[in-house]
Amino acid sequence: MAEADPKMVTEPAAQGVAEEAMASSACDSGDESDSNSSSSTTSCGSTGSSSSSSSSSSSSSSSSSGSSGSSSNGSHLHQKKRVPGPSRRAQRRPSGKLFMDKLPQAVRNRVQALRNIQNECDKVDTLFLRAIHDLERKYAELNKPLYDKRFQIINAEYEPTEEECEWNSEEEFSGDEEMQDDTPNEMPPLEGEEEEEIGKENTEVKEEVKDVPEEVPEAKVEEEEAPKETSEVKTEEKEIPKEGPEEKAEEQESSKEFPEVKVEEKTDSTDCIDIAPEEKEDLKDVTQANAEYTDQPTEDSTPRAPVREAQKRVPETRPEERVNIKRARKGKPKKEDPPRGIPDYWLTVLKNVDKLGPMIQKCDEPILKFLSDVSLKFSNPGQPISYTFEFHFLPNPYFRNELLMKTYIIRSKPDHYDPFFAWGWEIEECKGCKIDWRRGKDVTVTTRSRPAITGEIEVQPRVVPNASFFNFFSPPEIPLIGKLEPKEDAILDEDFEIGQILHDNVILKSIYYFTGEINDPYYHDFRDYGNRKYYK
């Protein structure tokens, strides 16, 4: 048997490997390989007896073996009707494998050693991410009383005091001013001057000590003068009782004056008796004047008539005025009660978030007015890393749920086929919840009825999905095998980004979204969502 040409053997084998690689991307390549293989086998069967055709028979056998494998793969893919592509979980072959095949074996061994070292580094990264998650959970407990107070103020359960309402910006900078006031104004003394000043201070202290005994005799003299003053006080006390008889004499003189006062009172009473007859005469004159006034008609009597008529007209106008007053009171708007808490707080916050604002439709706003709080909870130690957003709603006429949840699961294990695992947080999966809508209140769907060919309207209208913020709680599921549709993939990517924004900024700094400060151009340029994948 003649030896086979190595070129003729390797070329069909290479074609078979290439056909196997192309079979995963298209079914047509498999069909073409089937046709080529069948033609090659028929040609080989027709030429069979000559010794010179041994090389061609060996080459046809090798090509038939390669084509048989490709035909089997092609038929299997054609039956499945869907080519399994790379997904978020599917392991994909790295493009650097072809480069590794070109390297010498010794270099490949060393590169594999570096890969093993990198795997150990990825394990350290997982510990680092878990430690960050534990720190977040720890400090979330410290923030919990602050979040509770925020909830009470928003929902009018607590009214802040005047001190809590004051802006403490001046206190923040008071520390610098105090530090400046404490600084000495004079220059510190030099080394030689310090010794001279210390000597001067010692001499001054000695002089003060010498002056102290000279002051002691002066104190003794003052003590001797003190008993003299006490003796003088005693002599003054003795002189006080001598004044007693003089006071008694003055009292007797005052008693002698009282009879004169009584005499004056008696004279006044007699004068009153003498004046009484004159008063009687005056009274008689007054009565006569009144009689003459009544008999003679006066000119003042004529203008008094219209005054009396005006008095009669007053009660006629009063009922009309009262009616007008009542009408005016009805027309006036009633005084509105002052707002309680902070109305529409979370609705305003979510509308100012970049990715969530466009999702909120007009039909969503009346529902989101019942949103009382948004909180963040972290997974317990020992569980897979995840965090859950809790949306608390007040009782409302739209759905029966008081709590809507959205959970994001973080990838915490290294992926050998992802060289950028150490870049930070990456959301692996998200889960929503089911909303128990009341009848006719579901804003996530709408009904449409189209006329049939006959012109009649459909009895059962179609249910069509509707754009709404509450689609946020029903994200598309990630398949274990295969890949998502492009539209679903885009929705999921945006959902992951929203979860990152809520986690990093919205829950912690919601007040800046409410006031709109977060949309200021100064802050917009330096925004970072915490994940380099979504860095802007």
Curated annotation (Swiss-Prot):
Gene3D superfamilies reported in the protein's UniProt record: 1.20.5.1500, Nucleosome assembly protein
Annotated region described as Disordered, given as residue ranges: 1-104, 160-338
Bias kind Basic residues: ranges: 77-95
Highest taxon, organism lineage: Eukaryota
GO biological process, one term: nucleosome assembly
Subcellular localization, as worded in the UniProt entry: Nucleus
Basic and acidic residues: bias regions: 199-220, 227-269, 306-324
InterPro entries, A to Z: NAP-like_sf, NAP_family
Residue stretches of biased makeup (Acidic residues): 160-184
GO cellular component: chromatin; nucleus
Polar residues composition bias: residue spans: 287-300
Low complexity bias (residue ranges): 35-75
Pfam families xrefs: NAP
Keywords tagged on the record: Nucleus
The keyword Ligase is assigned to this record: no
Keyword Nucleus belongs to the record: yes
GO MF annotation, one: histone binding
Family: Belongs to the nucleosome assembly protein (NAP) family.
Protein name: Nucleosome assembly protein 1-like 3
Organism lineage: Eukaryota, Metazoa, Chordata, Craniata, Vertebrata
